[in-house]
Amino acid sequence: VCLSYSVRSSVETQKEYLVEQISCLVKRLGGTVTCIGEYPAWEYREQSPLRDKMIEIFEKQYGRKPIVQALHAGVECGLFAGQLPGLDCVSFGPDMKDIHTPKETMDVGSVERTWNYVLEILRNL
């Protein structure tokens, strides 16, 4: 039996702890553990001038507040922030459902809205 896990967390120490717990359990059951690749944690920043600016632009462009939330998903921001400490990162994109499943869908109209939003962000940086 081979089990594969993609362990992710927004807090590096919690991710390391979870990997250690899985490893201990597998070894206790007589198995072996091999760790291949990882996404570094991307920790939530209380202060983010970039996020604040993006919220301001979104509200002006769409007349409503954006949904802002911290996620545990492994995204490229963790890779960039891991290489450039102090980097202010924000992840956003089009509306998607059932990500990483055979039922994954993306709202095509939201792709255009996202593109227009990116252009406005770049104009305001």
Q: Locations of the language-model features?
A:
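Active/binding-pocket-proximal capping segment
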Residues: 21-29, 37-40, 50-52, 95-96
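Zn-dependent metallopeptidase/amidohydrolase metal-coordination segment
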Residues: 65-120
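Conserved strand-to-helix beginnings and helix N-cap segments that scaffold or border functional pockets
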Residues: 16-19, 47, 104
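A short beta-alpha structural unit
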Residues: 3-11, 32-51, 78
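Long, well-ordered mid-to-C-terminal structural blocks that present hydrophobic/aromatic surfaces
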Residues: 1-23, 27
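Short secondary-structure junctions
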Residues: 30-34, 65-68
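Structural signal for hydrophobic packing residues in well-ordered secondary-structure cores
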Residues: 22, 26-30, 58, 62, ...
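N-terminal/domain-start segments enriched in small and hydrophobic, helix-friendly residues
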Residues: 14, 39-70, 110-123
